[in-house]
Amino acid sequence: MNWDGVFFGSSTGNTEEVAELIANSLNTDLHDIGSPDAIKLIKDSNNIVIGTSTWGDGDLQDDWDDIMSEFQDIDFSGKIVALFGLGDQEGYPETFVDAMREIYDVVLERGAKVVGETSLDGYDFEESIAVVDGKFVGLALDQDNQEDLTESRIEAWCSNLSS
């Protein structure tokens, strides 16, 4: 499958770094959700990857929070969306990658087909609303506690997205 772009919001650079790895693996463009043309680019795309980090007790990253009302107005009918989220399973074990679920709910409600769910194997958290039917709704990453697993998780996930 060809991907039209990876859209991300990043505050500390971790999500941007991961988004770059994913974009390179999928041979597609990288777009900061905070840029003025991001919403238009999403509207004009068919197959997109969306990423966010989770802050505090399950909050969206600031750039996503800023554009969420516009994002919620996008018609995702006919679009394929894959999600990735960053979180801290030791510091916030009860809200691990919860922000990914907020985006998942919006795109699903607005008609997207969501792909790229992943297994819970190898993670150590207490709770996450980003778990649906026993799987994460996308790729869950922990750059704080499991950075050594990030590249292999991205490779496996992107391989599945490409097939």
Segments from the language model and where they lie:
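FMN-binding flavodoxin-like domain, especially the glycine-rich phosphate-binding loop
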Residues: W3, N14, S25, D29, ...
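A short beta-strand-loop structural module common to alpha/beta enzyme folds
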Residues: T28-I39
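Short, hydrophobic/glycine-enriched beta-strand segments
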Residues: D4-G9
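Glycine-rich NAD(P) Rossmann-fold beta1-alpha1 loop
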Residues: S10-E16
